[in-house]
Amino acid sequence: MLALAATLAGCATVNPYHDPARPHHRPDGFNNLHVDNHRADAPSFWRWQWERLFGERAADELHRVRSVPLDAPLLHGNRGDVTVTWIGHSTVLWQIGGLNILTDPHFGDRASPAGFAGPRRLTPLPTALAALPRIDAVLLSHNHYDHLDRGTVHALAAQPGGPPLFVVPLGVDLWMRDEGIPNVRRMDWWDRIALPGPAGEVVVHFVPVQHWSSRTPWDRHATLWGGYVVEGAAGPRPYRMFFAGDTGYSPDFKLLGERFGGFDFSLIPVGCYEPRWFHAGMHVNEDEAVRIHLDVRSRLSLGIHWGTFRLCDEPVHAPLDELPRARARHGVPDEAFVLFGLGQTRVLAAATR
């Protein structure tokens, strides 16, 4: 999100993976499929910053963002159940097929290129990275600082037992290479990879969503962004999960629902979307998140991308108030699209005993 500032400037880059047959490829980077790429002009950006500095903003009610003790015995002892644990923001631990998978891991204090400035973590981490089971795979959705944290990536690469497999969008592999991070698999939209697990094979697909990328003023849209579909065994039938990454609302989601036939569980962002005149199209609000839930045909969805950093103008606790209203507007049962407390775990499907 901090990389919004970097979208105000640009310098030509070369896309080493450019394939003219793919509509989302271009010689200097990548495109969205349904809208023009995010190009925040300088007057709009500085208007937003002026409003942030001098306008009225609702206070964060941080006490409303629950934190629960991590169920470490369950997570370390799990051998086949499908579980989900919300660590904060877009960082989620999935256990499926006997594998431990982290999405967009961020255990740092700031979502920023600098350790002394930028959006600070407002709610405490529910666990240290080292307290989790050994991580087998990391799914990175894009390279913004609230999703790709350098310190966390290096800590994971140095974990006991060896580094996880880092599954990353095209171009992010080059950043990993420059950082000396091993065991990286780059993915284009619709690529898939099969991960052998002790409780069965887990298949990971990289899929299109509507967003953008940048970490500097010179690499806008130079690397790809996206979401993930994860399929594995859960008892007698396959279990299918969707991670939307960071995204605006788009026709991509109905396509995903049709192509995969629906999802047992989805991670959908619900925070960082105000002011709408600036963020609409690239960040969903709660109403659009519920529409994604319906479009992808999700049986159960968990709201992410909230409760951790204040990156936009709505208060950190806003989804606690706005998601119930959005569910009611769309006729979605309360139990079908939920919010967790930090550190909360749920068993989604039990393995065959």
What is the meaning of each model-derived region?
Residues 1-9:
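Bacterial N-terminal signal peptides
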Residues 8-120, 125-131, 169-243, 322-344, 348-351, ...:
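Metallo-beta-lactamase
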Residues 12-37, 121, 128-132, 136-137, ...:
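Cap/insert and terminal regions of metallo-dependent hydrolase folds
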Residues 79, 87-89, 132-133, 140, ...:
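Extracytoplasmic
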Residues 102, 106-110, 187-192, 199-212, ...:
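Conserved catalytic scaffold of divalent metal-dependent phosphoesterases
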Residues 107-115, 126-193, 208, 216:
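Active-site HxH/HxHxD metal-binding segment of metal-dependent hydrolases
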Residues 107-124, 212-220, 274-283:
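Acidic/histidine-rich helix-loop elements
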